[in-house]
């Protein structure tokens, strides 16, 4: 899986965290691991321009998704495996997201993780134009965010335990001499 991040927003964000959440969602949604994803972070002026150009809507927005190759299951069982596919582009606006995060009472990192999930789901064909679609997409988005956060917490605790174990082993070696 290749995920490229280009931060043109002027705001310092954790690219590693964005890649982590995108990888997690792509794996959970059973997308071919050879798929490629591009993420671009823009300032509000550039996002407003993109929003007007592609959606004909004024002002910036939080996230936009631009799907590339259609990744549908199926095909003949004896057909060769397709090569790497370009999932698409996700464009995020951290400045806009920061305002949303403050209004929601959580961190910018949390908001950007949520928006990354939202963007990946759009690339996979999910939409929220109709009430039923919105209910399905937002429930899936919330579940994936919850699972990713739990995964991150577990990894953090495992890392801390490994560090404690390493220090304990180092101390025991000191006393063995």
From Swiss-Prot:
Binds 1 zinc ion. It is an enzyme of class 3 (hydrolase). The gene is ybeY. Belongs to the endoribonuclease YbeY family. GO terms for molecular function: metalloendopeptidase activity; RNA endonuclease activity; zinc ion binding. It comes from the Bacteria. GO terms for cellular component: cytoplasm. The keyword rRNA processing applies. The keyword Iron-sulfur does not apply. Pfam families: YbeY. Its cofactor is Zn(2+). GO terms for biological process: rRNA processing. Coiled coil: none annotated. HAMAP family: Endoribonucl_YbeY. Single strand-specific metallo-endoribonuclease involved in late-stage 70S ribosome quality control and in maturation of the 3' terminus of the 16S rRNA. Keywords: Cytoplasm, Endonuclease, Hydrolase, Metal-binding, Nuclease, Ribosome biogenesis, rRNA processing, Zinc. This is Endoribonuclease YbeY. Its EC number is 3.1.-.-. Its main location: cytoplasm. It is found in: Cytoplasm. Zn(2+) binds at residues 118, 122, 128. It comes from Mycolicibacterium paratuberculosis (strain ATCC BAA-968 / K-10). Disulfide bonds: none annotated. PROSITE patterns: UPF0054.
């Amino acid at each position: 899986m290749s995920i490229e991040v280009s931060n043109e927003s002027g705001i310092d964000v954790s690219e590693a965290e964005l890649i982590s959440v995108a990888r997690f969602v792509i794996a959970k949604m059973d997308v071919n691991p050879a798929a490629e994803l591009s993420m671009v972070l823009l300032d509000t002026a550039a996002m407003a321009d993109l929003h007007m150009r592609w959606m004909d809507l004024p002002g910036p927005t939080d996230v936009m998704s631009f799907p590339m190759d259609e990744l549908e299951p199926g095909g003949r069982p004896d057909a060769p495996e397709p090569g790497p596919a370009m999932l698409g582009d996700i464009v995020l606006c951290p400045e806009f997201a920061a305002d949303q995060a403050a209004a929601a009472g959580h961190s910018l990192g949390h908001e950007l993780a949520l928006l990354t999930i939202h963007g990946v789901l759009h690339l996979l064909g999910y939409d929220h134009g109709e009430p039923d679609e919105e209910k399905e997409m937002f429930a899936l988005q919330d579940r994936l965010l919850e699972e990713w956060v739990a995964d991150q917490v577990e990894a953090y605790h495992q890392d801390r335990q490994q560090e404690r174990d390493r220090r304990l082993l180092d101390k025991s070696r000191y006393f063995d001499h």
